[in-house]
Amino acid sequence: MSTSLAVLRLDRELPMPARAHDGDAGVDLFSARDVELAPGQRELVPTGIAVAIPHGMVGLVHPRSGLAARVGLSIVNSPGTIDAGYRGEIKVSLINLDPHAPIVIRRGDRIAQLLVQRVELPELVEVTSFDEAGLAETTRGEGGHGSSGGHASL
């Protein structure tokens, strides 16, 4: 099943977002300007594009795994969420996680990837208890934040 995505190029000199390989889930997003990030620094970087995410879908902006592994470049709010109603320029909140070296990004560098996925839009219903709502108790209950173990050394 194929769905189209309307892309508005705000900066015609930058490449159109594209998949690096046939079948890739994400399309590469490019930096619209030069940026230097000191260790620990974060910055909102424009991409030079806007998109019209269809209703019932969401755009998710993820880090590029190679940049994260090689130089420590990541996204502060990973993944960044682009709602269907947003029509402004996509900007990526990048952060340099390397403790020692600055990261230099040049205009036109690939900085992130955009995935577009279907999303459920459930109606929110307030209840006074889950029992009242007919939702069975689970074995997990309220356990979270490491409650399942798995890290004996921590």
Curated annotation (Swiss-Prot):
Enzyme Commission number(s) from the entry: 3.6.1.23
Pfam family, one: dUTPase
The reaction(s) this protein catalyses: dUTP + H2O = dUMP + diphosphate + H(+)
SUPFAM superfamilies: dUTPase-like
Gene Ontology molecular function: dUTP diphosphatase activity; magnesium ion binding
Pathway the protein contributes to: Pyrimidine metabolism; dUMP biosynthesis; dUMP from dCTP (dUTP route): step 2/2
Alphabetical keyword list: Hydrolase, Magnesium, Metal-binding, Nucleotide metabolism
Residues annotated for substrate binding in this entry: R64, S65, G66, N77, T81, I82, D83, K91
InterPro entries reported in the protein's UniProt record: dUTPase (IPR008181), dUTPase-like (IPR029054), dUTPase-like_sf (IPR036157), dUTPase_trimeric (IPR033704)
Cofactor(s) needed by this chain: Mg(2+)
GO biological process, one term: dUMP biosynthetic process
Taxonomy, superkingdom: Bacteria
Gene3D superfamilies xref list: 2.70.40.10
Note: Each trimer binds three substrate molecules. The ligands are bound between subunits, and for each substrate molecule, residues from adjacent subunits contribute to the binding interactions.
Task performed by this protein: This enzyme is involved in nucleotide metabolism: it produces dUMP, the immediate precursor of thymidine nucleotides and it decreases the intracellular concentration of dUTP so that uracil cannot be incorporated into DNA.
Family in the record: Belongs to the dUTPase family.
UniProt cross-references to PANTHER family, sorted A to Z: DEOXYURIDINE 5'-TRIPHOSPHATE NUCLEOTIDOHYDROLASE
Protein name: Deoxyuridine 5'-triphosphate nucleotidohydrolase
Gene name of the encoded protein: dut
